[in-house]
Amino acid sequence: MTGRVCRGCGGTDIELDAARGDAVCTACGSVLEDNIIVSEVQFVESSGGGSSAVGQFVSLDGAGKTPTLGGGFHVNLGKESRAQTLQNGRRHIHHLGNQLQLNQHCLDTAFNFFKMAVSRHLTRGRKMAHVIAACLYLVCRTEGTPHMLLDLSDLLQVNVYVLGKTFLLLARELCINAPAIDPCLYIPRFAHLLEFGEKNHEVSMTALRLLQRMKRDWMHTGRRPSGLCGAALLVAARMHDFRRTVKEVISVVKVCESTLRKRLTEFEDTPTSQLTIDEFMKIDLEEECDPPSYTAGQRKLRMKQLEQVLSKKLEEVEGEISSYQDAIEIELENSRPKAKGGLASLAKDGSTEDTASSLCGEEDTEDEELEAAASHLNKDLYRELLGGAPGSSEAAGSPEWGGRPPALGSLLDPLPTAASLGISDSIRECISSQSSDPKDASGDGELDLSGIDDLEIDRYILNESEARVKAELWMRENAEYLREQREKEARIAKEKELGIYKEHKPKKSCKRREPIQASTAREAIEKMLEQKKISSKINYSVLRGLSSAGGGSPHREDAQPEHSASARKLSRRRTPASRSGADPVTSVGKRLRPLVSTQPAKKVATGEALLPSSPTLGAEPARPQAVLVESGPVSYHADEEADEEEPDEEDGEPCVSALQMMGSNDYGCDGDEDDGY
């Protein structure tokens, strides 16, 4: 009995069966509940006597174990792919956020951005690390934290432009307007890295004031904030007597040297740069400057206009110069004397040529100047030819000449030479002066200080203050190298104390080998083997003897055994006894040769038995053939040497007798190759 009421009949007599897990009304028989799930915590006792709770707690975003139904049933109720992606993204966001020291609010916001990117399928085709870094930087921009995209690039070891491309894509697709970064956020961070000590706050405040002035002068828009921070910190450090070099600043703000110098140049063009330190700290100029890009554009426009004006003025000046040049040429033509006779015709021809060339426009200004100079030189020549002597202009119109042209001999005088002009004497003097002073040309190692003032030499010698400044500059430039050397010396000293230092052996100086002088290749190889032996297991004296006797000698040939020579001769002379294998009738029909064939004499070695030869039909009496028996070394003559070539002649089909053609060869022979039996 329970306090439940039946929904069918309203009775309260309800029977509960825990084994079946159902509730049935005993009045009407309706089933009120089926498969009742018990929600209380149950404990089970294990075989070892311990008790354990039944079931497990699964968090909302935690990775739970795969549930099992009994020992033999495993049900895979894992998460879907999107849930796994979100879980991995949250883990990576927390990992990177802890390295950047972001608070929990920023991490949750970044995870929300990541979920939006996953829902819009922006993670497809992109690495998850890039998307997570872009989400974190998006949070840094919206929340105003002093973090740069370069910091995330250093953590992930990824190109900063790749992360920037992903960040711009997320901001555009998610419709998030990322505000511009205020460079004032990075001033405390960079000032702490530059180590200003007790004046860190003062330098930071001065740098912030400089940045505000730069923002009012439109230097902030379109510029990287790190470059402005570097320029402001460099100026603020100099204002507070801190000597920070450009290299130290760019190593902290992570911009290139040209960017930092460009920001300083832009600040130098503003009126604020003309103020003193006290005036800058007390006075704020109300006027604002134009943006640097606009100023640069105006400057380029003015330069272009000036170039156009100058080009017009240059054209006007060139026109005036050409007019003056024409007037000068006209005056020179008028002042030129008129020639008579043959010279007049020559001058006329020259004038016509000049007129034609001027009409064609082939001569330039340089040719005109040369013509003017030639006209002045020809003027004296004409006077000399016409007057008989230089300077006698009146003789040109004297009746002695009578209008006759000068003789050809006077016109064909020899041209001036180097001797007549005195050039050879000057050349000889120059050569003699060079030969008399060989020390000046070659130099003997002594410095000639004659003609040099002492004050000029003193300017090359540094005084104490200049030497001290130069020494400080050298120490500052080579500080890193000196520090490494000190660390190296300390490490070596420590290793020597511990007894683990190994002395580096000095390198042996390699001597250049003298070239091998040899007349033949064999001699060169022998000398090379003497200098550098290939192997210690080779007796080079025996090898040298073998190489000297490698050509072969007569006594070695004579020492060969007798039977080898005779066997060689017999092997060359031996031919097949018969070449049967074809039909006898066809053999007779093919060969129209005499039935009797003469066999050449054969040499029989010692110990060989001569086989009896059967007589052939119609054999003609042949000359007796001598049997040569070799009993020792035999020297063969030319006829025997010719016999050695018989195998080449016997390649063809040999002559056979009638008995051989009929197949009645009664003396022993080997079986034919083509025997068909």
From Swiss-Prot:
Main location: nucleus
Sequence repeats: 91-172, 185-269
Chain sites annotated for binding Zn(2+): C6, C9, C25, C28
Biased composition (Acidic residues): 640-653
Example of a GO cellular component annotation carried by this entry: nucleoplasm
Pfam family, one: TFIIB
Residues found modified as Phosphoserine: S450, S553
Consequence when changing V542M: In a colorectal cancer sample; somatic mutation
Main function: General activator of RNA polymerase which utilizes different TFIIIB complexes at structurally distinct promoters. The isoform 1 is involved in the transcription of tRNA, adenovirus VA1, 7SL and 5S RNA. Isoform 2 is required for transcription of the U6 promoter.
Family stated for the protein in its record: Belongs to the TFIIB family.
Protein name: Transcription factor IIIB 90 kDa subunit
Protein source organism: Homo sapiens
